[in-house]
Amino acid sequence: MLNRVVLVGRLTRDPELRYTPNGVAVANFTLAVNRPFSNQQGEREADFINCVVWRKQAENVANYLKKGSLAGVDGRIQTRSYDNNEGRRVFVTEVMAESVQFLEPRGSQSQGGSNVDNFGGGSPNNPMGGNDFGQQSGGSGRQSGGFSEDPFANDGKPIDISDDDLPF
């Protein structure tokens, strides 16, 4: 059997970080993922997919991602159910993220033209920010792509993105 999900989208709200009674970090967030086709009005629709990430990755997601951040998620679909306050059974489908990739330079959402030399959400404490945060050190770490500069920095043209282009 195979249960594998790969998503790329933007967060619709800031991640919500909690801790279990045993002290294990868990973060919830929702990704807006564009559908590959347009509806009858010519508009692109989006799916809003709930994601859950655990442990150190959850803390990293809460610290470095926010509403509007572009992220990649690799994981599996999981369903659960519970009885709500009215006694009705509620079914929930969510992606249990095994890996979360930060797909934009840190601070690009709020600082416009920040000069960041590292794609993937890296920081001085975590130079391989775009890699799987759940891997133990000493594992097979991959270098992030070889990007050294913002490809749009010397273009001289403003990037024109309207609110209609955003999936949230």
Curated annotation (Swiss-Prot):
Alphabetically ordered keywords of this record: DNA damage, DNA recombination, DNA repair, DNA replication, DNA-binding
Q: Which CDD domains match?
A: SSB_OBF
HAMAP family noted in UniProt: SSB
In terms of InterPro entries, this protein maps to: NA-bd_OB-fold, Primosome_PriB/ssb, ssDNA-bd
**Molecular function terms, GO-annotated:** single-stranded DNA binding
Q: Which GO terms describe its biological process?
A: DNA recombination; DNA repair; DNA replication
The role this protein plays is:
Plays an important role in DNA replication, recombination and repair. Binds to ssDNA and to an array of partner proteins to recruit them to their sites of action during DNA metabolism.
Per the annotation, the residue ranges of the short sequence motif Important for interaction with partner proteins are: 163-168
Bias class Polar residues marks the residues at 107-117
The answer on whether this UniProt entry bears the keyword DNA damage reads: yes
Q: Cellular component per GO? A: nucleoid
Region annotated Disordered, chain positions? 103-168
**Could you tell me the gene encoding this protein?**
ssb
- Name the UniProt record assigns to this protein: Single-stranded DNA-binding protein
Instruction: Describe its assembly.
Output: Homotetramer.
* Stretches assigned to the SSB domain: 1-104
- NCBIfam families named among the record's database cross-references: ssb
